[in-house]
Curated annotation (Swiss-Prot):
Cellular component aspect of the GO annotation: cell outer membrane
Subunit and partners: Monomer.
Membrane topology of the entry: Lipid-anchor
Keywords for the protein's UniProt record, in alphabetical order: Cell outer membrane, Chaperone, Lipoprotein, Membrane, Palmitate, Protein transport, Signal, Transport
Family affiliation: Belongs to the LolB family.
Record CDD domains: LolB (cd16326)
SUPFAM superfamilies hit by this protein: Prokaryotic lipoproteins and lipoprotein localization factors
GO BP annotations, alphabetical order: lipoprotein localization to outer membrane; protein transport
Protein name: Outer-membrane lipoprotein LolB
Pfam families named among the record's database cross-references: LolB (PF03550)
Record's keyword annotation contains Glycosyltransferase: no
Length: 180
């Protein structure tokens, strides 16, 4: 009986791995920055063993971004608003402001959300104008971040299904559930 359970578990594990493949970064196109999009999904962050998980809805309407951070039940618990004038974070009836998302989220949440680069990375593109390197496995190194792109193996898509970012004890994972 135990052997059957182990074999079934192994088969399910292998089947789950078979549905993913690496998504290789493409050269960044300047025109892509101006392409609006709406994306929903899940976000997880783990900083030195402490984890946070949330759902998100992100509207990118250049030069503005609006990211709603939602609880697992769908309630909006925070909003990040970015425009040329800076960034505002609204949560718990409070308002924080800064010049950029990275410093604001580091100050309030304890870890930086690289939104200015994530505009590119979520599409499987390196951010333009910034030095980057792609290794043999298709992983991107840019601005101190190690980025891994993963796609559904059975779906031909112009963007990755999952983006995993690591830097200085911090791992941020973004899983795309819908893209428009």
């Amino acid at each position: 009986m135990i052997r059957r359970v182990l074999l079934l578990s192994l088969a399910l594990l292998l089947a789950g791995c078979a549905n993913e493949a690496l998504f290789r970064p493409k050269p960044a196109l300047e025109s892509a920055a101006d392409a609006p999009f709406s994306v929903s999904g899940r976000l997880s962050a783990n900083l030195d063993g402490k984890g946070h998980v949330a759902n998100f809805d992100w509207r990118h309407l250049p030069p503005r971004d609006e990211v709603a951070i939602n609880s697992p039940l769908g309630n909006t618990v925070a909003k990040v608003l970015r425009d040329p004038g800076g960034v505002t974070l609204l949560a718990d009836g409070k308002r924080w402001q800064a010049d950029d998302v990275e410093s604001l989220t580091r100050q309030v949440m304890g870890w930086p959300l690289p939104l200015s680069n994530l505009v590119w990375w979520i599409r499987g593109l390196p951010a333009p104008g910034v030095e980057s390197r792609v290794d043999a496995d298709g992983n991107l190194e840019q601005q101190g971040w190690h980025i891994r792109f993963i796609r559904d193996a059975d779906v031909d898509s112009d963007h990755p299904k999952r983006v995993e970012m690591q830097r200085e004890g911090l791992t941020v994972k973004v899983v795309v559930q819908s893209w428009q």
